[in-house]
Amino acid sequence: MKNINPTQTAAWQALQKHFDEMKDVTIADLFAKDGDRFSKFSATFDDQMLVDYSKNRITEETLAKLQDLAKECDLAGAIKSMFSGEKINRTENRAVLHVALRNRSNTPILVDGKDVMPEVNAVLEKMKTFSEAIISGEWKGYTGKAITDVVNIGIGGSDLGPYMVTEALRPYKNHLNMHFVSNVDGTHISEVLKKVNPETTLFLVASKTFTTQETMTNAHSARDWFLKAAGDEKHVAKHFAALSTNAKAVGEFGIDTANMFEFWDWVGGRYSLWSAIGLSIVLSIGFDNFVELLSGAHAMDKHFSTTPAEKNLPVLLALIGIWYNNFFGAETEAILPYDQYMHRFAAYFQQGNMESNGKYVDRNGNVVDYQTGPIIWGEPGTNGQHAFYQLIHQGTKMVPCDFIAPAITHNPLSDHHQKLLSNFFAQTEALAFGKSREVVEQEYRDQGKDPATLDYVVPFKVFEGNRPTNSILLREITPFSLGALIALYEHKIFTQGVILNIFTFDQWGVELGKQLANRILPELKDDKEISSHDSSTNGLINRYKAWRG
């Protein structure tokens, strides 16, 4: 992968000049000038997904210049580097191969000269055998009863991805009840343990090293709770499995290493749901549906790695994001799924994007002088319309939005879905085109009111519009289409990282807080006054000690 400061490229300079020409052009102007705009600025993927990016402040010239930027930053070379197993995560000297986990073509992918696919397939087969035993009831707990509940204990990528997918694919779930514990706050695991029976519960402990503080604290609490009922430590093996590579620690915990599902250092945490970390997904929806999830992602991988930039959906979305972030000064992006099953999708890509591209040092080790990753946030529609859309419509900040919805609902109840989708379509139209003062005044006249007598309120009812959006319409949310959608966003993030000249696949920003917490923890064991920190931290710790009793 080449290390190129994007602002030093000819394409960036051309984009800056183009922005000066485009900054006052409105979306309404663009549609007025081109009645065929939708067909030019939208694309369908696999007859499963329609991506409409026409309601953006872009022209064909904008996209051409953005694609020039991608070429100058050697995006094509970077894609080849990732897919070929090159160690593009240089700060950790690791390959980045979540694409291998869903490589349904089974073509060889080499890391250090070794094909990783046989090991990937072996773990998948092990997940299949294990999950079928649990789901069928063949696997029995220590009292001879079948498993009814599965508790996934993990944090970050070991929690967010599996939780998001099991929720999004709830229509495909079987009889097993799924629970997720992540927070080291004892409340989280306490509330889950109130809902389950030790005789019929399986715990999945998801930690590559089996040393993650939050995960292992929760795992030991779960083990203690279990042993209060089961008594004999030998029963742990029937109720705990590990998603880890540390066989020694797993065995010491009491887990049979035959029930340890491994993954590799080329699997990043926030890209790990495709690996053994996805065992909770397999247990929830069955192995065949998990394979469909992998297949959808693999289809998007093929699209991303083989399609020219001008038709490449992850690349197009990435370039449009850079356009807003670096030229229009937009600091955030909202992800707004109009599907309640997708209620964790924005949170998942909050981690996926912000932990990947929230970096201020470039691949050369220099502090950047441009914007890198945006702030990602969002909630399901229509809830968000009654919460924060006010700011998106009439606030002073530009918030580019992705609207996501399925054409077919899993719950065709009365006219609910038509009402949901009417809002989905209406919001992007309102954001793009707004409502002028003239229209507001005419509405008053149509109601038999004199606008002059209501002059004071008219400005508050004006919508400027010109707020950019992408619309992603899925045929239906299925394992396949969800896999493709997740991979679409993953590759968008990768593309932006390449162009912004940052390392997308490390996360050193999480380390300092952990180090300081490990230093502070022993200081909380007694009642001595603390003076080893700054005055604020000392004051907080000492007040905590005084109040805890």
Swiss-Prot record:
Gene3D superfamilies: 1.10.1390.10, Glucose-6-phosphate isomerase like protein, domain 1 (3.40.50.10490). GO terms for molecular function: carbohydrate derivative binding; glucose-6-phosphate isomerase activity; monosaccharide binding. CDD domains: SIS_PGI_1, SIS_PGI_2. Pathway: Carbohydrate biosynthesis; gluconeogenesis; Carbohydrate degradation; glycolysis; D-glyceraldehyde 3-phosphate and glycerone phosphate from D-glucose: step 2/4. The modification N6-acetyllysine is found at residues 80, 228, 234. The keyword Cytoplasm applies. Its EC number is 5.3.1.9. One of its GO terms (cellular component) is cytosol. It catalyses: alpha-D-glucose 6-phosphate = beta-D-fructose 6-phosphate. It is found in: Cytoplasm. Keywords: Acetylation, Cytoplasm, Gluconeogenesis, Glycolysis, Isomerase. The active site is at residues 355, 386, 514. Pfam families: PGI. SUPFAM superfamilies: SIS domain. One of its GO terms (biological process) is glycolytic process. Catalyzes the reversible isomerization of glucose-6-phosphate to fructose-6-phosphate. Belongs to the GPI family. NCBIfam families: PRK00179.1. This is Glucose-6-phosphate isomerase. It comes from Shigella flexneri.
